Amino acid sequence: GWAGRGGAAGGPPAAVPGQGNAQGAPQAPAVPPGEWRPWRFRMSNDVWGTPVVSSGRLYVTSFEVHALDVATGRRQFKTRDVAWTMAVSGGRIHGSDGPSLYALDAADGSEHWRTGVDGWIYSLRADAGTVVTGTRGGGVQVWDAAAGRLRWERGGAQTEFETPESGPSVVDGVVYFHGGGRLHALDATSGAEHWSYPTGEGGAMPTRPVVADGAVYVTVGNRVLALDARSGAERWRFDAPAVMFAPPAYVPGPGVTGGGVYVADYLGTVYALDPADGRDRWRVATEQRQSVEPVLVAGGSVMLGAGGALYTLDAVSGTPKWRFAAQGEIVGSPVVADGRVHFGSKDHCLYTVDASGGQLRWKLETGGEITGSPVVSEGVVYASSKDRCVYALNAVKGTEAATRRA
């Protein structure tokens, strides 16, 4: 059974010093040398999605993209245009306001290039010099990230689920997209098709594929497929009793050490599949979940938010370890760092619990639901809330100050 933990007795909400404000509020007092203090930055508009940390900056989407200094929380710049979608890669911010695509310097916000698009961009991914966009009506465009030049475009992508989670993606120089009941794999440079595979699930929500160790893993409807990355040939398939909204999570290695393919269906049942043949090693029921986030596998444990609780299972055996109950639905994906698990909830709180036993270490009560997933970098956890704020907290002690890392 589950070792139950709860967040109701987590103590009073923590106070966070205000470090910045979109309306020009006074700056916080100077921080003593060698000390880092938690900070909060309040936007003038709603904050959405998951923040991105890169090269000493925190990038947050709040209509525009805002670049904040991770040490102080002071805003370095913001974009002049709306960014409905954003990707940070190769020292650049790639964003779209819908009908246009642009690239900015991630250090100072200066514009590198901008181009119009024939359609409305709903999905944007960037990787290794390539930008891939999906447009309403089944369009797929592939761009050179350096110059903004259109390399190639295709039609015929699926239109039933035009969401960022189901849009086209790029991995290791290959562009993947769903269309016509098939998963297509095309060369990111030339657009030549490497292969396509019939997924056979018309009308079912497809997910972005996971590519690892020469295989492509993808969920479509209630099916998990493992395909050869070079040829597209099917290695195995697994049919679950219920539909899956989230992509699989892959862990290298044999099952006896926790390796495998891990998926969860919308009823909250977690499956551990053998990566060699797709055999169902174990399955464990939790609570119904609507999340499009994959389960998290870290430190020999499988973690997932389901309903209003965070569940942790042993990756090898599926044995329940612990369950932490929040006061609202878990949002996004948890993140594990230095023996702690950080996650947000619709109950307005950001939680930090012990990874081994699920004991509450600290929580922060904000003025709204947590949005996206928290991010941890160099001992700091960052999270956004529907109270229009982004928070930077000491990952160990929450709102307490910390010694700066050299």
Model-based region annotation:
Residues 37-38, 74-77, 110-113, 149-152, ...:
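A structural motif specific to WD40 beta-propellers
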Residues 6, 20, 76, 142, ...:
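Positively charged, low-complexity intrinsically disordered regions
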Residues 20, 320, 324, 393-399:
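Generic cytosolic/nucleocytoplasmic N-terminal low-complexity/intrinsically disordered segments
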Residues 24-44:
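A short helix->beta-strand "capping" segment at the edge of beta-propeller domains
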Residues 44-65, 79-102, 106, 115-141, ...:
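Repeat-blade elements of multi-bladed beta-propeller folds
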Residues 1-31, 403-406:
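Sequence/structural signature of beta-propeller modules
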Residues 69-72, 105-108, 144-148, 187-190, ...:
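Short loop/turn segments that connect beta-strands within beta-propeller blades
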